[in-house]
């Protein structure tokens, strides 16, 4: 049983994006002690891309005795690229191709790309096998972006990136298939919270979308990047924690206490 029936201290991070040094600094500052049996680390997806230490991130997390790893859309991009055997332009701009190089211990993009990606996926497979789509405690649900929803009556078939997409709450979200979970990893969670799509009775903790966007939505700041607020954003029974590490050089650590489900 994970955690047993006692209160545990949960240290929650998201969107590490290959920044191992920043992760360790943030956890140390928050008081995380991997030797403490009451301390658990929960990562809300997007462990790789953009930073230059994806292997260090993967090695550190896989060796932690108490952790929960959540799958994000960048893990989806990485798997898709490796299975495809070649990089699309967005894989180059997102840093996914570079992640494969770093995980595969390749210095430069050269040679047989499919071999590079096969090697990277072999090294990453034990890590990927540990990832969940969500994790639930007595009072919280941890996801990368959101839980799977259902299309609303006015849905026009447009995909996740459409700004005017409106969904409805899915009471059977726990039974969603992987395609539905993959779709849920891409939307704007602050917009979904604004549409009152959290009817779970619990607080949804997410990353994916920089928390400054939520603060701007609430009128706490005027811009998402200039003079922005990067602290966790509490909004309609949700908490957004993505600090946009590639921009800020920092990672938020949300520390909460809760009981695991029996």
Summary of predicted features, one role per range:
Residues 4-6, 34-36, 63, 195-200, ...:
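Flexible, charged surface loops at secondary-structure boundaries
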Residues 15, 46, 61, 72-73, ...:
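Divalent metal-coordination and catalytic microenvironments
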Residues 12, 41-43, 69-70, 141, ...:
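Residue-level marker for buried hydrophobic side chains located in beta-strands
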Residues 100-101, 106-239, 244-249, 260:
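Acidic, His/Gly-enriched loop-helix segments that form or flank divalent-metal centers
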Residues 255-259:
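Short beta-strand-to-coil "C-cap" segments at the C-terminal boundary of structured domains/repeats
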Residues 17-18, 49, 75-76, 147, ...:
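Short, glycine/acidic-enriched loop or turn micro-motifs at the edges of active sites
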Residues 1-59:
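N-terminal active-site segment of His-dependent metallophosphoesterases
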Residues 37-38, 54-138, 168-171:
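Active-site neighborhood of divalent metal-dependent phosphoester bond hydrolases
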């Amino acid at each position: 049983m994970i955690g047993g029936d006692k209160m545990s201290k949960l240290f929650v991070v998201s969107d590490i994006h290959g920044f191992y040094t920043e992760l360790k600094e943030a956890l140390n500052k928050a008081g995380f002690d991997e030797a403490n049996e009451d301390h658990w680390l929960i990562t809300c997806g997007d462990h790789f891309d953009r930073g230059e230490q994806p292997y260090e991130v993967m090695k550190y997390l896989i060796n932690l005795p108490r952790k929960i790893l959540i799958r994000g859309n960048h893990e989806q991009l990485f798997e898709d690229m490796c299975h495809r055997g070649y990089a699309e332009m967005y894989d180059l701009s997102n840093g996914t191709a570079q992640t494969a190089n770093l995980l595969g211990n390749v210095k430069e993009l050269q040679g047989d790309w499919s071999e590079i990606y096969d090697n990277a996926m072999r090294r990453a497979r034990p890590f990927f096998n540990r990832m969940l789509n969500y994790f639930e405690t007595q009072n919280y649900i941890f996801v990368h972006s959101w839980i799977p929803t259902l299309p609303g009556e006015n849905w026009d078939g447009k995909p996740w990136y459409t700004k005017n997409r409106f969904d409805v709450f899915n009471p059977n979200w726990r039974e969603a298939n992987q395609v539905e979970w993959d779709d849920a990893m891409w939307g704007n969670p602050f917009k979904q919270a604004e549409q009152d799509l959290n009817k779970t009775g619990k607080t949804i903790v997410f990353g994916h979308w920089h928390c400054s966007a939520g603060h701007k939505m609430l009128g706490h700041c005027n811009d998402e990047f200039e003079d922005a607020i990067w602290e966790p954003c509490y909004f309609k029974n949700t908490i957004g924690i993505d600090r946009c590490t590639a921009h800020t050089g920092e990672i938020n650590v949300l520390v909460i206490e809760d009981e695991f489900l029996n």
